[in-house]
Amino acid sequence: MASAEIIAVGTELLLGQIVNSNAAFISEELAANGIYVYHHTVVGDNPKRLKDVIDIAEKRSDILIFTGGLGPTEDDITKQILAEHLQKNLVEDAFHMNEITEYFASRNRTMTENNKLQAVIIEGSTVLNNDYGFAAGMFLKENNHTYILLPGPPSEMKPMFSSYAEPLLVSENTEKNVLESKIMRFFGIGESQLAADLNDMILAQVNPTIATYAGDNEVVVRITATAKTKEEASALVNETEQEILRRDGTFLYGYGEVSLPELVTAMLLEKNITISAAESFTAGLFQAEIARFPGISKIFKGGMVTYSEETKQSILEVSPQTIKENGVVSSECAKEMAKNVSRLCNTDIGISFTGVAGPDSLEGHPAGTIWIGLHVAGFETEAYQFVYGRDRNHNRRRAVKQGFQLIKQFLDTNK
């Protein structure tokens, strides 16, 4: 099976001035067609280093896809260096030259000589039309390798690749397989623990493959299988998925690109369950997160940020006796906050966050000690304690996600 390498040319990429989004786009498109990308390479606008990269890439890859370096300036060197490497001439493409000439003429502007370079191609190439710019792309087969040259700007590269390069590449790749992937999302278990639970599967993996990634207070597992048909690949993925669920399914919250807050918000909207929030150490993070989603005004009625004892009492109407006897970092305070915000905002669910963000301790409780209260109309109010680390903002973000998870667990249990 053919292997591909994406070579991004541009010093600005190495300096971090531009993110290499082209490589991600091309890799995803090729994966959908069963073509494996094994290497991403970034090289600056330097002739010698680009030559070295080409030499290395040819030894390990069948398909070399270049992005960038096709423009009119002196540092646009991709086609010149590749032509020299392949011992081929550069020739003018009449169609693109006419496009460039007409563009400048229609605007009564003088075309500089260097703009003509964008219509120059490597001899023997199949020209890839640029529908959104001037620089012509190229598709070339030589010495058992396929070379594809694409412009750097994503607005030009993406349509050129999708409309012209990809169909050619897929038709040439007669041994293509189908690649099928599934993303599983877990909360409440660390990456190291999940990896340990799946260790024997990861060590023995061939097809499908299993990869774990640490996300924002969650763990993502990607299962990828290849087969001759989509049905065969899906069957391989599903078999592995079921074994993962058997081991750690209690921590699974969803699939694909849907985040935990987005999933829970959709569940609340679907069931038309209203919600409000009372926040202390999270200082409005939960409310800011839930407010990100369209249509939220149908179910999110509002909330309160009561950071001090005084505002907990005066605004949220938490009993002074509750705070005096138990402190603000307590089950009793969390429950009362959740009940009161639900009553004051007239909502089905009230959720509260109180605790020690860190790095210092509070009321004898170490940093990272938090309580989340959950009040649901018709059910007993509950409070849940968690102990995290000393990183203040990490604790706040994690608590918010934990709050969404508690709501999801309630909704799953009481359908």
UniProtKB/Swiss-Prot annotation:
Belongs to the CinA family. The gene is cinA. This is Putative competence-damage inducible protein. PANTHER family: NICOTINAMIDE-NUCLEOTIDE AMIDOHYDROLASE PNCC, NMN AMIDOHYDROLASE-LIKE PROTEIN YFAY. InterPro entries: CinA, CinA-like_C, CinA_C, CinA_KH, Competence-induced_CinA, MoaB/Mog-like_dom_sf, MoaB/Mog_dom. It comes from Listeria innocua serovar 6a (strain ATCC BAA-680 / CLIP 11262). It holds the Pfam family CinA.
